[in-house]
């Protein structure tokens, strides 16, 4: 997104796909049916183009950097929809469900990054979808279950992280002290 004008940004697949999602009447119906609100909070590199995004849906908010605290948003959110963001690890650590919307999966791996050790379909913490229709279906499934994480996914998350508690700082401090002695 670096170096793009807003007009150029509005021509990108990224903008067109996410704009289509946040303005989709089906999303509004799902949110209303299950009693949820959504916050579209794009990556900080996209925040400068935030004025390009719009929605008429009262249950869909567009989150601006500085107006919404990311930590609070993560803590208060019941479901995360992301693409390839590392924020997924924070959300999974809280044992919350995720959906990966990877509409540009082939191009992402072909031009942006090399595939590393992490395979979203194997190692990820939620369903990978590549179409808007599949995304809306995954959202409905999650909302209908009150955003519950399946026992299988809970096991996967626990196996990935080992210890899930609020004592990480203490463990890190102790490990550093042991290394220094």
Language-model features, listed with the residues they occupy:
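A structural signal for isolated positions on well-ordered beta-strands in alpha/beta enzyme cores
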Residues: 37-39, 61, 99
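Acidic, amphipathic alpha-helical patches
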Residues: 27, 70, 125
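Short beta-strand/turn micro-motifs composed of small residues
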Residues: 40-42, 82, 102
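Conserved catalytic-core segment of nucleotide-activated headgroup transferases in glycan assembly
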Residues: 1-52, 129, 164, 168
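Catalytic binding pocket for nucleotide-activated donors in carbohydrate/polymer assembly enzymes
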Residues: 52-57, 84-160
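C-terminal alpha-helical cap of glycosyltransferases
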Residues: 165-181
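Donor nucleotide-activated moiety binding/catalytic core segment of transferases
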Residues: 44-89
């Amino acid at each position: 997104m670096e170096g793009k004008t807003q007009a150029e940004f509005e021509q990108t697949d990224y903008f067109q796909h996410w704009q289509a999602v946040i303005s989709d009447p089906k999303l509004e119906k799902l949110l209303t049916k299950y009693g949820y609100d959504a916050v579209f909070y794009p990556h900080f590199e996209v925040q400068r183009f935030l004025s390009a995004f719009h929605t008429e849906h009262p249950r869909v908010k567009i989150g601006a950097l500085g107006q919404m605290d990311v930590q609070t948003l993560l803590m208060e959110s019941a479901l995360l929809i992301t693409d390839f963001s590392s924020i997924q690890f924070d959300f999974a650590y809280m044992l919350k469900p995720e959906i990966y919307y990877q509409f540009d999966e082939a191009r992402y791996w072909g031009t942006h990054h090399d595939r590393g050790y992490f395979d979203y379909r194997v190692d990820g913490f939620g369903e990978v979808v590549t179409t808007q229709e599949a995304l809306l279906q995954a959202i409905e499934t999650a909302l209908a279950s009150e955003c519950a994480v399946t026992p299988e996914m809970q096991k996967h998350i626990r196996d990935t992280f080992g210890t899930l508690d609020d004592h990480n700082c203490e463990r890190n401090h102790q490990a550093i002290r042991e290394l220094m002695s």
